[in-house]
Amino acid sequence: MDALVEARGLKKKFGKVTALSDLSVELPPGQPVAILGPNGAGKTTFIRMVATLIRPDEGTLRVGGRDVMREPMAVRRTIGLAGQAAAVEEMMTGRENLVMVARLYGQGRKEAVASAKRILSQMGLEDAADRRVKTYSGGMRRRLDLGASLVGAPRLLLLDEPTTGLDPGSRNEVWDAIREMGAGGTDIVLTTQYLDEADHLAAHIVIIDGGRVIAEGSPDELKSRVGADMVELHTADVETMRRAAEVLGALGVAEPSTDVATRRCSIAAPSGSKLLPLVVRALDDAGVAVEDIALRRPTLDEVFLALTGSTGSASSTSTDHIPTNPKEGAAA
């Protein structure tokens, strides 16, 4: 099966800043893809190239088999883009927003009204369809914005930080909408600053650092690269956590890690479940009581840290040094 997006040797500089440095990747069709990376890694630059908004200095980029440099208009007809901020008109109703977008796509009045009705249903916004958008919650606005990106029935939907700034409840609403869009046959590529979001939504994850791809695969494949499972324990207080870390360190298996905020301590378990009873025995001998203890897989956050040296929180809404000059954003 041909790649949905195929990049070869992409390079891009903004002044003295290198945004992309020999980036090569093939994004598979038929499964949602998440682009992860530290602040300034090149995520947004890459997404905007795929959207034909930025031209590469070097390299080739094909979307759906079409070269973005030679056939930008043909590429644009196959994609939808939802940026970091919801691009909706607050003084109009949700229905009016979608009808307006549909008319801009060239649909007649009757067809535009039908498109708006269909998308409002798909996004779960029927009850709020005739309310002004200024009365919507953040999650509702974001779902409306996602719906607007579907008006042209794109084969590929590009989502740049789709849940940034939303509360947990609104994030879950948007996650449900994204899952439904994917289930409906739309290919989705998203950038995100939330590792749990990538873990929940993506079947394929691409990690970018320093303007190039450093790892990719399914969440399980990436987690397996960290290596061993982890023995993790939770204590009642920080002092007990520190004592537990000393006990784990004395086992000589690996260096334990601690999280003061959650009072958790973990250690790599190369031997898997065989280490668990040894840890329990050592803690008991030292008189260290724990709230709970378990064997678990590495988290995506640990994968991210191992590969980039940054925690997930370092991946933010950076525009990757992209200038606002409209001439720089021209695709053709």
Identify the residue ranges that each predicted region occupies:
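Conserved ABC transporter NBD signature motif
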Residues: 59-70, 75
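ABC transporter nucleotide-binding domain
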Residues: 175-270
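Helix-to-loop junction immediately C-terminal to a conserved catalytic motif
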Residues: 51
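Conserved ABC ATPase "signature" region
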Residues: 99, 103, 110-128
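Catalytic Walker B motif of ABC-type/P-loop ATPase nucleotide-binding domains
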Residues: 157-160
